[in-house]
């Protein structure tokens, strides 16, 4: 049985770990993985069809705890204890729920003090007692006398027994129905760098140059207290490994690309140009970005931006990359009657973000009609339970699209000649790389 301390508006945890409101989904999963053998029977619930409209939930049925994450920010917004019998709970070190201490009305008021009168939900037959950042729910029979104007303690119970808490909710703010998602707490920074936004830099001729990143991390003020520190960095095609490491710090992982499963779609000349050295990936998981360096020139030739949607093979590996860029539309917008809404001479752009669906993009851009079907598996002869994705090429971009039309990732290629050596340019022509997928 878990023995946990609650801090209203802040956290639920113990000396070894804690679930903190505002923490990222992947951080909560990391805690659960560290407690293997202690926390069991974990369930992850999400919507395949509307991943942005339904909360992501981590359910711990054997411990009576439920973690509710905002589907857009993917940060923890509510902690629920839905079975009080499966967990011990303390407040300022004093138990208010355990096998020896029942969480009755009197016990809750004794532990947490006075608060506003409770609110009765006749439909659910629950009485809710709200504190700031904390709510308790008591099952109350509908035949109960309605003299509760002065709080739960004024209720007259027919059998003389005070009800006990059936559910507890921990959240930020004073209203559980309007609880906000906190920003990432400083205690969850762990000396990592995080992304606020990423702007794709493109030339007037439609070529990608690189990325402009707005970042934040843990800094220190005059009193040496931790605080949020913000700054901006630019990554450009042709940057060396040292340039990127200087701008972003050491990557979370370095991956040597030993094979390219899409190489067969390239020309025979490029397939024969095999290098004994491997291209190198810098994986920045907390930024949602991969940087690929050419094995020959040791310079950046590709960026991969991940959206971290549930139901994708790489879900929970990356934080969502909040990217944004504009593409000039190839097709004019159409009205419901089928007539053009803009004149052919007027330029129109498509704003693409991590939340733009492929249906909206493909209706405005002349993308490749037939996608490349991408199958992923963790090892040879193993199945991918999440299914395949579809890759569409457009200019120097590749969109990886999920079956629900959401973008799983965007790959940005370098279509300009590399800084060195010049003769390697023929290996990166767009007609070959537009079908290449990391």
UniProtKB/Swiss-Prot annotation:
Keyword GTP-binding: no
Function: May play a regulatory role in autophagic activity.
Subcellular location, record wording: Cytoplasm; Preautophagosomal structure
Source organism: Drosophila melanogaster
Keyword Cytoplasm set for record: yes
Matches recorded under InterPro entries: PHAF1, PHAF1/BROMI
Official protein name in the record: PHAF1 protein CG7083
Biological process, per Gene Ontology: Golgi to plasma membrane protein transport
GO cellular component, one term: trans-Golgi network
């Amino acid at each position: 049985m878990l023995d946990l301390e609650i801090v209203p508006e802040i956290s639920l945890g113990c000396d070894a770990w804690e679930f903190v409101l505002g923490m990222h989904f992947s951080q909560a999963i990391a805690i659960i993985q560290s407690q293997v053998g202690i926390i069991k029977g974990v369930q992850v619930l999400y919507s395949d069809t509307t991943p942005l409209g339904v909360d992501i939930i981590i359910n711990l049925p054997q411990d009576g705890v439920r973690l509710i994450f905002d589907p857009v920010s993917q940060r923890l917004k509510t902690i629920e204890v839905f079975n009080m019998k499966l967990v011990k709970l303390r407040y300022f070190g004093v138990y208010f729920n355990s096998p020896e201490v029942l969480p009755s009305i009197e016990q809750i008021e004794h532990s947490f003090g006075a608060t506003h009168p409770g609110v009765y939900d006749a439909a659910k037959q629950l009485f809710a007692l709200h504190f700031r950042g904390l709510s308790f729910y008591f099952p109350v029979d509908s035949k109960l006398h309605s003299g509760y104007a002065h709080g739960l303690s004024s209720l007259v119970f027919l059998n003389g027994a005070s009800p006990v808490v059936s559910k507890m909710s921990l959240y930020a703010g004073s209203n559980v129905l309007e609880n906000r998602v906190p920003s990432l707490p400083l205690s969850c920074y762990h000396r990592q760098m995080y992304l606020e936004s990423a702007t794709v830099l493109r030339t007037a001729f439609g070529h990608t140059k690189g990325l402009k990143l707005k970042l934040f991390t843990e800094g220190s003020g005059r009193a040496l207290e931790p605080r949020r520190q913000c700054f901006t960095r630019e990554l450009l095609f042709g940057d060396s490994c040292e340039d990127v490491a200087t701008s972003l710090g050491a990557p979370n992982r370095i991956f040597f690309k030993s094979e390219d499963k899409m190489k067969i779609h390239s020309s025979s000349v490029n397939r024969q140009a095999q290098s004994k050295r491997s291209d190198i990936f810098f994986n920045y998981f907390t930024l949602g970005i991969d940087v690929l360096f050419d094995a020959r020139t040791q310079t950046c030739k590709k960026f991969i931006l991940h959206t971290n949607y549930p139901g994708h093979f790489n879900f929970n590996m990356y934080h969502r990359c909040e990217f944004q860029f504009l593409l000039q539309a190839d097709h004019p917008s159409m009205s419901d009657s089928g007539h053009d809404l803009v004149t052919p001479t007027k330029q129109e752009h498509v704003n693409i973000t991590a939340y733009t669906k492929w249906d909206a993009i493909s209706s405005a851009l002349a993308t490749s009609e037939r996608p490349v079907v991408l199958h992923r598996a963790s090892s040879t002869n193993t199945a991918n339970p999440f299914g395949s994705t579809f890759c569409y090429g457009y200019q120097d971009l590749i969109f990886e699209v999920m079956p629900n039309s959401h973008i799983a990732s965007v790959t940005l290629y370098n279509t300009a000649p590399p800084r060195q050596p010049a003769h390697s340019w023929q290996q990166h022509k767009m007609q070959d790389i537009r079908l290449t997928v990391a």
